[in-house]
Amino acid sequence: MSFRDRFQNLKETVGQWTDSSGGGSLDRKIERNLAEMEGGTEIERTAAVKALVIQAQTDDKWADPIITSFLRVLPDQLASPQEAIIDGLLELRKIKVSREGEIFESIQETLDSPYPSVRSKVVEIWTRFSLKSDTKTSDTIAVLFEMLSDDDKDVRYQTQESLSKILHTVPKVALPELKNAIGDDDWRVTYHSIVLLTEFAKKYPAPSVVLAPEVIEAFNSGERLKERAADCIGMLGLANPEAVKPAVPGLIKGLEGKSSELRKACATALGRIGSKNGMVVYHAVPRLARALKNDDWYIHVEVVKALGYIGSSKPALVKPHLAIIRNRTTTGADRNICKAAEWALKKAGGG
């Protein structure tokens, strides 16, 4: 059956169950829908839930019993009825404000739902909840950080996007939670948290620097996180080179790593740090010059730019290597390398 047919069936079923004409009182219709919500097919259950929401809004005496039934069956429902119940509970809390606490507690528990679509839905709800002016608490934000360890990639990336909104809206509340997340034992939580901090540091570098020790520790903890952590360290180094100085030996070592992406990220980070204080990265200059001589031309643009940035801060550090930079203005493996070398030569005082 096509999606359109399934949708039409659902629409017709809801219509049948909410139609006031036909046999039976409203009470019997509600009782039938409550039973169908637990024993019908997925489509029938979803339709029953939608009908019950309307019926609870129609007859107040049924609102509490229907909410209670929703809370009871929510954990064990299939994907579509779970989503329908969540939507229904959010609607019914408006008429039963006293039950808001248990409703949100029950919805939060569906973050453990076996269905990625449900988990994604709850992440979106929790994001809205976290951004409300009267509920900007670390507890709700901490729940979202836990979702960065979700087994489903789409859920993780949606959570990352949601946390980015929160981080940019309430940084004072979110940054302490981000700090904890960067130090999490689950590499996925750390990975996504570093990406979040990197983006945040581009706009708000000063408050981000306080997390430099955690990022450096992540960089040194294993290969899985090095590339992203190097990128973040470079951004933090633009704000405060001294804060990331402990990372420089690892970044230098990374220039000779197995991955071209890691070598490129380390070169970029060293250039960013060196653009603000060349002396912090002075040990890296000979290694960068050596990297221009190897066959991995994929990283040469970032390497030569790093030398240019460092040279703009401390020309004397790069002066012994101007010849290799000048050579790459004509012998670079592609035009981008040649142009980057020309730029670097001027920045370092050799052009």
Give the role of each language-model region.
Residues 2-46:
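N-terminal "cap/leader" segments of large eukaryotic alpha-helical scaffolds
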Residues 323-351:
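Eukaryotic acidic, Ser/Thr-rich intrinsically disordered low-complexity regions
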Residues 42-43, 79-80, 116-117, 153-154, ...:
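Alpha-helix N-cap/helix-start positions at coil->helix boundaries
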Residues 24-35, 60-73, 97-110, 134-147, ...:
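Amphipathic alpha-helical scaffolding segments comprising HEAT/armadillo-like alpha-solenoid repeats
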Residues 147, 152-165, 169-172, 177-178, ...:
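Solenoidal tandem-repeat scaffolds enriched in leucines and small polar residues
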Residues 217, 222-293, 298:
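Eukaryotic tandem repeat interaction scaffolds
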Residues 46, 50, 64, 68, ...:
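Alpha-solenoid HEAT/ARM repeat scaffold
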